Amino acid sequence: IWCQGLTELGASFCSNTSSCTSTEVVNYYFKDTTVKSLSEVSLSSPDIATDNNALWVGLARNARSINLTTLPSSSPPMLSICQDGLSDVAGVQVFLTSRGFEPGPVDGAFGDKTSNALKNYQASVGLSQSGSIDTETLNKIKSEASSDGSCESIFGPLKISGGATINVISNGNGCYFNGHPLVNRTTASCNIGISWSDGGRIRIGPREHKHGVLKLRSQNVSSGFHVVLSVNIEKYLYGLAEMPSHWNVKALEAQALVGRSYAVYQYLKQNIPAQSTDLNAGLSTSRQAYCWCHIGSTASSQYYYGYLKEIAGPNWVQAVNNTSGKVITYSGGYTQSSVIQAFYSSSTGGKTNN
């Protein structure tokens, strides 16, 4: 049987003192298994091998608020905020702002500044310059916004540049933003997606995130909202903080194989392919209630620390890249699409292998 579990100290000792390869380390601790590329495995949910941000990683549960800071402060990224449930006025203000028409803050109040901005937009697309949100104008805005790509809002994303610490707060009726002149405590849904431009990152609590899209979800959640990172499996592994980054690359390669296998197993276990989209992780109602995630970010699943782990030392990222797309498989039971739930620990006192 394969399920003995990797010990990290044992993997490090073997790799440091002999010619053990990462595959040999894995085969020692997980008997009768085979390392394969995901492309060689018939996956029940193949998006994990191809979709850029298929894996949803739980960062916080039942949050009442979060503070999000853009980094680096010297050259902060542009934020793109997609919020479901905006009123037509607030949604039109978001759209006009993203197109450079300057309707004023997104406050849901239709004043002269919003009306004038709307007239300018109507003129730019050949519509009657009524300055009001008529059906023709609203349909045109929604049609154009749909070209922006996947977004929780039918009006497209609100784009904020120049650096910011944004607060997202649940008030019991929904969520609102503050902390920037463009947002003005307008309550809408807590179904929110936040992305940032390439090269930048965001900080939430102790973690920094360079990759993925931040997701807030409140559907089927008992209180507040869950905070999740939708991220590519390889970029997720960059932030997996289970072994010191300076350890031997071969030992770290074994850890990368184990960590990737564990994450893929959890994804396949939780994901419902027919329901999975960029905006919906394809999770059961009970899983949505619990975390809106395929996998957690604490030691009870795998400890995910994000960008600060990625820059802690070159060996870990090299190990992830060296094993890119590879998982541990087993032809027997207790697997997901033959991918094992690869358990591991720091040390077991020498008692793992039969």
Give, region by region, the residue ranges found by the protein language model:
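Conserved, single-site charged/polar hotspot
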Residues: 1-104, 109-354
